[in-house]
Amino acid sequence: MKITTSKQMAFALLLFASTVFMACNGSSDTNSNNDSTAVTHSDSVQHNAIATHAHATISGTYTDTTVNGSASFDQTDGKVKMVLDLTIPAKANKSVAVHLHEHGDCGDMGKGAHGHWNPTNKQHGKWGSSSFHSGDIGNVELDGQGKGSLTLETDLWSIGGDSTTNILNRAVIVHGGVDDYVSQPSGDAGNRIGCGVIQ
């Protein structure tokens, strides 16, 4: 009877030790899975923090020229859609050039924005041609009341992406003349009569 009890006790201890070992091993796997889930959740939160909408309110840079307008930017499926609306009564029945410039600074009659935004170091040209700046939007035709609009959709821009595509904190510049799409470095588009910062 003593031998049977000892064998039973030894078997029970062996069974207990195996159970503890398996439980510890399983616990380690569970913690590993939790860590992986936590990282995935963190990545997801960072991804959701990227903006999908931006806006610029465009105002005149000269006291003798009324310029009102807005540019709305929405990002969906890797593309940014811009809807630009302008009202410039002094330019009724004419066209004006619009470009994105490097810096979001409308000071000094728009000169604070510096040159055209050109992260790919290409020659100035017409949007969609073999060579053009990422900021070369083009000409906007105005009606008899000086109102005009333009819609553009592209995968060359992003809202909050890397420096080669990010349009945030750039300036939307309205020029007094038209872009000839040939003259370097900016299409001979004339003075900067309107400006707005993309935010």
How would you name each of these model-derived features?
Residues 1-3, 24-26:
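Extracellular low-complexity Ser/Thr/Asn/Gly-rich intrinsically disordered segments
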Residues 2-12:
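Bacterial N-terminal signal peptides that target proteins for export
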Residues 19-23:
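C-terminal motif of bacterial Sec signal peptides marking the signal peptidase cleavage site
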